[in-house]
Amino acid sequence: MRTLVLDTSTNLLYISFIENNKVIYEVSSMGLNNHSDHLLPLIEEGLNKHKLTIKDFNKIILGVGPGAYTGLRVSMSVAKMFSWTLNIPLYTISSLDLLSSGYKDNGMYLVKIKAKKGFIYHKAFKIENGFKQVIENDMFVSEDYIEKYSEGTIISNDNILVDSLNINEKELQLVDNVHALEPNYLREC
């Protein structure tokens, strides 16, 4: 079983190849409005390194936002193309879940990914004994919104931590029609 994981919703370009529950290739690269220049060459680099083709993957997981309009379109276009042309099942996940998947310790977590003009993409969740409880689902709010929380680890653009092996299968959504798939732009308060 091989899985391709992609997300370009923020300044972070994330790619992971998972084979039999082991990450065999991973790229976590910060960029500024240049994911379209790097995504396909980095995927190709991983394929060449492991002597694979996209046909060798059984599943694609795509972070669908919320996030930057152009950034979301980059990985979404690639994932949809691979899924449609090669008949590979495509699953979506909130980018906020994916970009915070490396946080596993007990505690409260406040995702605060910078949007524009004083706003953030936010999610609040608590982890207790390995179980994740969502307190507030994906939101587009003012930067000061999370000040209402007296405690919690703030996850921002500076400390995104992805662990593609820690993706909760319950957070995945199978895409029935790749042509109808749209990013989660989340632009309303």
Labelled PLM ranges:
Residues I43-K59:
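Phosphate/pyrophosphate-binding loops at sites that engage ATP/ADP/AMP, CoA/4′-phosphopantetheine
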Residues M1-K22, N34, Y91-C189:
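Oxyanion-binding and handling regions
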Residues H50-K55, W84-S95:
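Phosphate-handling active-site elements
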